[in-house]
Amino acid sequence: MTSVHTPSVALSKYRDQHFKGSRHEQERLLRLTSTLYIGNLSFYTTEEQIHELFSRCGDIRRIVMGLDKFKKTPCGFCFVEYYARDDAESAMRYINGTRLDDRIVRVDWDAGFVEGRQYGRGKSGGQVRDEYRQDHDLGRGGYGKMVQMGQLGANMRDS
């Protein structure tokens, strides 16, 4: 009799659009992984702060900070890799939606860190979600990059 591992913490609808492999393979890896994607971090949150919070759920293999691909400075996300899936499930259950550095962090399953994914995918080097942000968010560098460069209005007029 074969059994299918079903996570006790449900998978979200988010999928990495740059995943190298089939949708089926990505789903399989997400159900087995002990790696988490952590989003909505302040640009000033340190690896030590992340370690202090996430180590409450278990032993951490490594933390990979998300970096602006041009400046090599933190850009609001990271990957936390645990030794055990159960510890990652605890972090999903108990840390997702809590505050770190006065921000509500988003914790999601990740199919496994691959070199290069630590860099932001936005045109300006950071995260895509920060490119077009029109609100002023001090913890994420102020206004979105397009607003800072005065391009948002021009882009909207051209549409």
UniProtKB/Swiss-Prot annotation:
PROSITE patterns noted in UniProt: RRM
SMART domains reported in the protein's UniProt record: RRM
UniProt xrefs under Gene3D superfamilies: 3.30.70.330
Annotated residues for binding of mRNA: 14, 37, 106-110, 117-121, 127-128
Any Gene Ontology biological process: regulatory ncRNA-mediated gene silencing
UniProt cross-references to CDD domains, sorted A to Z: RRM_NCBP2
Pfam families (UniProt xref): RRM_1 (PF00076)
Subcellular location: Nucleus
Keywords recorded for this protein, A-Z: mRNA processing, mRNA splicing, Nucleus, RNA-binding, RNA-mediated gene silencing
InterPro entries with a match to the protein in the record: NCBP2, NCBP2_RRM, Nucleotide-bd_a/b_plait_sf, RBD_domain_sf, RRM_dom
Domain RRM: residue ranges: 34-112
MF terms in GO: RNA cap binding
Signal peptide annotation: none
GO cellular component: nuclear cap binding complex; nucleus
Disulphide-bridged cysteine pairs: none
Chief localization: nucleus
Annotated function: Component of the cap-binding complex (CBC), which binds co-transcriptionally to the 5' cap of pre-mRNAs and is involved in various processes such as pre-mRNA splicing and RNA-mediated gene silencing (RNAi). The CBC complex is involved in miRNA-mediated RNA interference and is required for primary microRNAs (miRNAs) processing. Also involved in innate immunity via the short interfering RNAs (siRNAs) processing machinery by restricting the viral RNA production.
Subunit organization: Component of the nuclear cap-binding complex (CBC), a heterodimer composed of Cbp80 and Cbp20 that interacts with m7GpppG-capped RNA.
Family assignment from sequence similarity: Belongs to the RRM NCBP2 family.
Protein name: Nuclear cap-binding protein subunit 2
Species per Swiss-Prot/TrEMBL record: Aedes aegypti
Gene name tied to this protein: Cbp20
